[in-house]
Amino acid sequence: MKPFIKVGALSVAVIAAAVLAAAAYAGPAAPDVPEAIAVPEGNKVFLVGEAVGVQIYACNAVAGGYRWDFVAPRANLYDERGMLLTTHFGGPSWQARDGSLVVGTVVDRAPVAGAIPWLLLAAASTSAGADGDRLAHTTFIQRIATTGGLAPAEASCHAGTVGTQAEVPYTADYYFWKATGSGS
C-alpha cells in the first residue's frame, strides 16, 4: 500500500507562503541593459541604489587650449524607501554604512544622449567594514538610468578659469552584483 498524505487548505496556504517568501528573498531583478554593459552569467543582483550627487570636473590648460577633465563623483545612494545605502566617491569607490568598501574599474560603457554614459564596472578590490560586509562580495557594478553629469561647455574653460572645478548634478541607478552562491 502506498503512503497517503492528506493535504488540507492550511497546508496549501503554508506551502504557498513559503514559495512567495522564497521568491521575495531572491533579491532585486537584473536590469535591461545594452549588451556592452551586461554582467556575465554566474552573478546576481544583491543591492540597488539611486544616486543623487555631482560629477566633479577641473578646468585644465592643454596643448592648444583648455579642457574640462573629470575629477571624481560625489554622491549618496538611497534605497527605494529613501534610506542611505552607500556613499560614492573617487576611485570610483562605494562605501556602505557598515564600513565595507568596493573599488571599481570600468569594463565598458554605453553612451546616452544628454547624460553621462551607462557603465559596467568590475570590482578591483573589496573589503569588509568594522560593522559588516555588505559590499565585500561585490563582483560587478552597473550604472544605468543616468541624468545630467556631463562636463560643462568647453567655452567656460579658459585662461581665467584654469584650476577651477565645476560640480555638475547627476542621478543614476547603481546595481551591485555578486557571484551566485556567494555569502552575504
Where are the model-predicted features located?
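Bacterial N-terminal signal peptides that target proteins for export
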Residues: 1-11
